[in-house]
Amino acid sequence: MARSTARRRALNTLYEADEKGQDFLSLLDERIAQPGAQTPLPEYAIEIVRGVDEHRRDIDSQLNTHSTGWKVKRMHAIDRNILRIATWEILYNDDVPDKVAIDEALNLSKTLSDDAAPSFIHGVLSAIVAAKDKQSPQSTPLDDSDKDESDQTN
């Protein structure tokens, strides 16, 4: 099953739990045990929900830091959970390129949210990626001035 479908199924689970005030993992366990009319949850959807739950405090902190004028609790539930999924993918899932995480979040927001959501989501996620890139130093080769003098021969 495509990862896009898995993201959407994870979003459905996170959104439903959020709206009900239910714990993410307890609803996930219900969905795994009794998928109802839908096909069983894809493994990647389960991984997303568990990952978002495990890192929720840090994810929400990142969202609060990088969203101007909007705290997580004030965001629309659908936008909040789209952002949580993409932030988890950006910060905790090295298998997904940052650009893909952002593009997938934008696709979900264009279909499921209001007209202002895609630009808001893009801005927040771009800021998170920029902060992540700033924190992870790029390795650069040493030039001659960085070498220890004992390594140089006369």
UniProtKB/Swiss-Prot annotation:
Disulfide bonds, paired cysteine numbers: none
GO terms (BP aspect): DNA-templated transcription termination; transcription antitermination
One GO CC term, this protein: cytosol
Superkingdom, natural source: Bacteria
Biased composition (Acidic residues): 143-154
InterPro entries, A to Z: NusB-like_sf, NusB_fam, NusB_RsmB_TIM44
Region feature (Disordered): 132-154
Keywords in alphabetical order: RNA-binding, Transcription, Transcription antitermination, Transcription regulation
Gene Ontology MF, one: RNA binding
Keyword check for RNA-binding: yes
Pfam families: NusB
Record function comment: Involved in transcription antitermination. Required for transcription of ribosomal RNA (rRNA) genes. Binds specifically to the boxA antiterminator sequence of the ribosomal RNA (rrn) operons.
Homology family: Belongs to the NusB family.
Protein's name according to its UniProt entry: Transcription antitermination protein NusB
Organism of this sequence: Bifidobacterium animalis subsp. lactis (strain AD011)
